Each structure stands twice: as C-alpha cells, then as structure tokens.
Amino acid sequence: MDPKSPEFIIDQPLKILGFVFDELSATRVSGHLTLTEKCCQPFKVLHGGVSALIAEALASLGAGIASGFKRVAGIHLSIHHLRPAALGEIVFAESFPVSVGKNIQVWEVRLWKAKKTETPDNKIMVSTSRVTLFCGLPIPDHVKDAPDELKKVISKL
C-alpha cells in the first residue's frame, strides 16, 4: 500500500486495518473489511473500538462531501454492539445522512456480516451507530489540498 496514494490519504487508520471503500458520496459511504488480528480483541472477535472508528470515519467522509468538502468534526458518537463478528469474517459498512444542516449533520452507520446461508435478508447486524458532526470548520493551511485529494479518490470509485 503506497502511503502517498490519494486513497491512503483519505483515512489512514482504516486503510492500515485493511478497510476498502466501495462508495463515497454525499448520500452514502460504504465499504468492507476482512477481520484480521489487527482489528480483533483477544477473543478473536471485532474490537468495539474498531467499530467506532469505522462509524466515525464513514460519517465524517460523507458529511465532508455533503458540506461541499468543508472540514467536519465529530461531536457525538453513539454505538450499539449487537452481534460479534469473528476473525476471518467480512464486515460490511454503510453510512447515510439522517439530517444535513448548514452547521450540524447526523449520520447513521450500520455494520453487518453475511449469513452463511442464502436467504432473502442475508445480513446479520453487528452494530448500529449515530454520529453527530459539526460542519464548515476552516481547513488548516498544511492540509489545504485534502479536499482535492478526496475528490480524486471519489472519481476513481
């Protein structure tokens, strides 16, 4: 993984864990992660802190896009851990806006894994989250190019 690539730049902690973005837009951010030991607790299941990291990262990216590529900051995260996901399983994640205002946005984030059998509803919910974000913050000079890098990544998905 090239640390200078635009895709790596958008969220280094998630990329280090192996998270792959599937969609980035103002109305939906999604991706997936194969669970390795890096993201599991000693009991070989997904660490709750990793679930929280995914939730805040996806909501922040979506809110940043929805705000016109302005800087955003998470001000509240509420997460419910519903079921475990084990080492080796693939966890899917999606985030979508609940409320998009000029200064405050609220995003819902869901993590799930696939059932082992084919059924009409093939999802086992792992966690659900709500993330509240403050939007429109100034972008510091040393990262002024961050919005352009994010736009490059979006154009490649």
From Swiss-Prot:
A Pfam family: 4HBT
One GO term of the biological process aspect: phylloquinone biosynthetic process
Disruption of the gene: reported phenotype: Reduced DHNA-CoA thioesterase activity and phylloquinone content.
Main location: other
EC number: 3.1.2.-
Motif (Microbody targeting signal): 154-156
Classification via InterPro entries: HotDog_dom_sf, PAAI_dom, Thioestr_dom
Pathways involved: Cofactor biosynthesis; phylloquinone biosynthesis; Quinol/quinone metabolism; 1,4-dihydroxy-2-naphthoate biosynthesis; 1,4-dihydroxy-2-naphthoate from chorismate: step 7/7
CDD domains for the chain: PaaI_thioesterase
Gene Ontology CC, one term: peroxisome
Active site (catalytic residues): 56
Cell compartments where the protein resides: Peroxisome
Gene Ontology MF terms: hydrolase activity
Subunit structure, interactors included: Homotetramers.
Similarity remark: Belongs to the 4-hydroxybenzoyl-CoA thioesterase family. DHNA-CoA hydrolase subfamily.
Function text: Catalyzes the hydrolysis of the thioester bond of 1,4-dihydroxy-2-naphthoyl-CoA (DHNA-CoA) in peroxisomes, a necessary step to form the naphthoquinone ring of phylloquinone (vitamin K(1)). Displayed also slight thioesterase activity towards benzoyl-CoA. Is not active on phenylacetyl-CoA, succinyl-CoA and palmitoyl-CoA thioesters.
Note: May originate from a horizontal gene transfer with a bacterial species of the Lactobacillales order.
Name by which UniProt lists this protein: 1,4-dihydroxy-2-naphthoyl-CoA thioesterase 2
